[in-house]
């Protein structure tokens, strides 16, 4: 079998040959990571020897291999391949395996005839060789597309990973299941080489590990086609493509989970559901349209609710964790980015009825009482929070399963409570356990919050979420609130009905101007005393660009009252500085004065769309130029090329509708 390509790798961590087989496993079990035209694969039965039970997926593997041997035994035969296949049944235990896998293509209008294809994969452990034997529609071997990947030791820590094909000249490519030879050499081989020497384990499970990938792919494409017009009529300010296709993917996942549940438990009636914190309600709309009775509840009504029609039941109401918000007749509770309700989903489900199950997709980090406080720096904040929500489910008596969804989001791990760990007769005892656990979490929140607020050595907070790894302190006024009858936790605060604007845009104008000027002086001058010394040379030919400081260094020079005001805004100091992009440049948490001599549209790496590159004529010269007024060297641009007014005589009236909180004309 001729060699097509080879890549040399250095095994500095001594992970080979184990790392090679780990990389092969990724290509075997998750080919969509590399081949984006695939939805995934299903790995069928694995044999250590070909014997009596050699049939799987309607394919008799032993018979198929015998037929392949016969076909390959003619003139021009490949002795090495014949030896590999014929000797397979005689190999020693643990020396290799044979696996049947099915490659599942995505539905693609450019490749409408492409169907799932099977292939037999032979792993030869002693020789570090993996062989792929593809099958056609009639389950006959496509000998032209047989290929091997081999690992070989060169010398010292140097190894080679090579690609071999049986007949590269006659290779048949459909662009999906069978990629082109050039792709195999350039993409597949290089990735396998990279993965082979990586000593990195994922914190999360494989994507779609709890559902059949082929079934998911078919249903997702059907639903995507069915609800794609929602993108065209989306009335919300959010990105329609992201939200529509994300909800279609979540609905697909739930529908398959529920279908599998009905099949396993021999149920005929489709499961009912309630989506707590349903947001735009699209998930509720899709699930209802697909025949599942249910409703969505959210504290704030959305514009799009009116478009769904009467069959989609959506309610505007705040949800409180108490005895009045139980759902005894509901099969499933859903928490899709449900924020402060996320940890309460398992509790509400467990207390609604013994048969109630739940699905939760955590996003923002909340505990029972407020913002979640990190307890360990050994894990990422996301992983730690997932473990917390999983622990809540387990303490509530659920067998909690974890899976990764295939959605356009960085927060795509879901937790599912599908069954209980205890019999119904133990409900009273388990509920007492739940109560104790919730109280213990309440105490932990107060303890961590108090410790954080008393720690005088902590640097000042930079934004509304983080404080040296901690999150917002618990409001002490909530601690003293009285427990209402039937309430499970005093002081729980649902989200506000009117979504507050916290992007620093509504802060007092004087406060913004003062903070901007203070930060600018900090960057432009070496000290803030009366005799300020410019950072750069005082020569008139040099425009003072100042220095670069980190956000933390800037925050250390600001007054505590200023930081507290910024702490209540999303993004805090960073958002304020980015809002004033005429003055500042913020990249990777480093702040500097923007130099408009260099930052011109022609110098930017990525050109923005034409509509965003040009400034509307009705806003030109409607505000004073900050640099003209405040910079020691004035504005680096001449008045004609600056969109802001150089002096009051250049100011033009603005025709843009005024805000509720009007600002003065000084540009920041």
Curated annotation (Swiss-Prot):
GO molecular function: tRNA (uridine) methyltransferase activity; tRNA(Ser) (uridine(44)-2'-O-)-methyltransferase activity; zinc ion binding
Gene that encodes it: trmt44
Function: Probable adenosyl-L-methionine (AdoMet)-dependent tRNA (uracil-O(2)-)-methyltransferase.
Disulfide bonds: none
Keywords: Cytoplasm, Metal-binding, Methyltransferase, S-adenosyl-L-methionine, Transferase, tRNA processing, Zinc, Zinc-finger
Designated name of the protein: Probable tRNA (uracil-O(2)-)-methyltransferase
UniProt GO cellular component terms: cytoplasm
Catalytic reactions of this protein: uridine(44) in tRNA(Ser) + S-adenosyl-L-methionine = 2'-O-methyluridine(44) in tRNA(Ser) + S-adenosyl-L-homocysteine + H(+)
Zinc finger residue ranges, C3H1-type: 620-649
GO BP field: tRNA methylation
EC number: 2.1.1.211
Record region (Disordered): 441-460
EC primary class: transferase
Record's subcellular location: Cytoplasm
Chief location bin: cytoplasm
Family listed: Belongs to the TRM44 family.
């Amino acid at each position: 079998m001729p060699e097509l390509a080879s890549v040399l790798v250095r095994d500095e961590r001594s992970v080979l040959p184990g790392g090679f087989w780990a990389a092969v496993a990724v290509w075997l079990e998750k080919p969509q990571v590399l081949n984006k035209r695939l939805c995934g694969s299903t790995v069928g039965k694995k044999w250590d020897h070909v014997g009596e039970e050699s049939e799987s997926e309607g394919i008799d593997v032993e018979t198929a291999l015998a037929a392949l041997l016969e076909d390959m035994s003619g003139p021009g035969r490949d002795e090495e391949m014949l030896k590999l296949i014929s000797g397979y049944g005689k190999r020693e235990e643990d020396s290799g395996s044979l696996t049947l896998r099915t490659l599942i293509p995505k539905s693609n209008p450019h490749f409408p005839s492409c169907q799932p294809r099977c292939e037999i994969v032979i792993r030869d452990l002693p020789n570090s060789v993996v062989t792929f034997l593809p099958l056609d529609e009639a389950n006959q071997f496509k000998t032209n597309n047989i290929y091997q990947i081999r690992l070989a030791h060169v010398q010292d820590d140097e190894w080679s990973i090579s690609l071999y094909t049986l007949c590269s000249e006659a290779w048949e490519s459909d662009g999906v299941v069978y990629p082109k030879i050039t792709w195999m050499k350039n993409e597949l081989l290089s990735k396998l080489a990279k993965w082979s020497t990586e000593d990195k384990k994922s914190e999360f499970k494989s994507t779609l590990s709890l559902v059949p990938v082929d079934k998911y792919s078919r249903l997702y494409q059907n639903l995507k086609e069915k609800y794609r017009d929602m993108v065209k009529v989306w009335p919300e300010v959010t990105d329609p493509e992201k939200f529509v296709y994300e909800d279609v993917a979540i609905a697909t996942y739930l529908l398959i989970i529920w279908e599998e549940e009905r099949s396993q438990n021999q149920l005929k009636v489709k499961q009912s559901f309630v989506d707590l914190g349903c947001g735009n309600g699209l998930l509720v709309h899709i699930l209802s349209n697909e025949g599942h009775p249910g409703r969505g509840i959210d504290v704030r009504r959305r514009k799009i609710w009116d478009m769904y029609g009467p069959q989609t039941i959506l309610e505007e109401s705040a949800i409180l964790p108490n005895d009045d918000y139980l759902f005894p007749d509901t099969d499933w509770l859903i928490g899709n980015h449900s924020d402060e309700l996320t940890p309460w989903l398992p509790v509400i489900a467990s207390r609604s009825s013994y048969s109630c199950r739940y699905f939760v997709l955590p996003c923002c980090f909340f505990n029972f009482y407020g913002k979640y406080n990190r307890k360990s720096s050994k894990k990422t904040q996301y992983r730690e929070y997932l473990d917390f929500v999983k622990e809540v489910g387990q303490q509530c008596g659920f067998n909690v399963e974890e899976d990764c969804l295939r959605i356009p989001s960085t927060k795509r791990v879901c937790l599912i409570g599908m069954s209980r760990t205890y019999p119904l007769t133990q409900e009273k005892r388990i509920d007492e356990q739940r109560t104790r656990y919730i109280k213990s979490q309440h105490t932990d929140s107060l303890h961590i919050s108090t410790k954080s607020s008393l720690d005088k050595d902590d640097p000042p907070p930079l934004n509304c979420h983080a404080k040296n790894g901690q999150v917002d302190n618990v409001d002490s006024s909530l601690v003293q609130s009285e427990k209402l009858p039937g309430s499970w936790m005093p002081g729980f605060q649902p989200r506000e009905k009117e979504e507050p604007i916290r992007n620093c845009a509504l802060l007092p104008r004087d406060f913004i101007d003062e903070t901007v000027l203070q930060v600018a002086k900090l960057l432009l001058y070496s000290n803030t005393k009366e005799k300020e010394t410019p950072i750069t040379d005082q020569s008139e030919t040099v425009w003072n660009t100042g220095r670069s400081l980190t956000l933390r260094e800037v925050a250390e020079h600001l007054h505590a009252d200023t930081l507290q005001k910024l702490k209540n805004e999303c993004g805090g100091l960073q958002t304020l500085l980015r809002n004033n992009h005429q003055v500042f440049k913020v990249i990777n948490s480093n702040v500097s004065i923007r130099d408009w001599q260099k930052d011109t549209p022609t110098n930017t790496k990525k050109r923005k769309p034409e509509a965003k590159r040009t400034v509307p004529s009705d806003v030109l010269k409607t505000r004073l130029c900050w640099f003209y007024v405040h910079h020691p060297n004035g504005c680096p641009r001449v008045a004609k090329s600056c969109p802001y007014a150089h002096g009051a005589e250049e100011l033009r009236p603005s025709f843009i509708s005024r805000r509720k909180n009007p600002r003065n004309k000084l540009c920041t």
